């Protein structure tokens, strides 16, 4: 790909920005007197309190996490795709396979281990999310604690010296993370295991 190094750098740049800086930037932009609401007012629309609405606060948190980690996930997947032997693609095209068929039958199965890795790490990162909602909502999880995460609850119990509850939350969080990670990993790599088992049986015969 032409200029692939440049595009990789541009895509990865948001990942280098600290979560605290990202949160403060979004807090300023989407505040009641921020540039987004000023633009809405100039268009004759009422002020939308992003941080006071459940959909607004959750949407901003989701958008920030997407922007911060999109680059990292893209680079990992691109590395997996670029590592595929081009000879396999050329052979498939010669056999008359379409681009969609090549992607579905060749590219996707080959990068499944990488997809499993990205899904599991994204899942763990989502469960352990703390810095963005903590800073954006000033640690309160507003509105009405709908933006509270498990780690924010854990942090509150630690600061209130309720160490028993904090320890219990840590264990529960670990179990949930482990179970979900194993489920996602096995679900994504299921076809690979089945294919490998069938191949080994044929080889023995």
Go through the PLM ranges and name each one.
Residues 1-205:
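A structural signal for multi-pass alpha-helical bundles of membrane permease subunits
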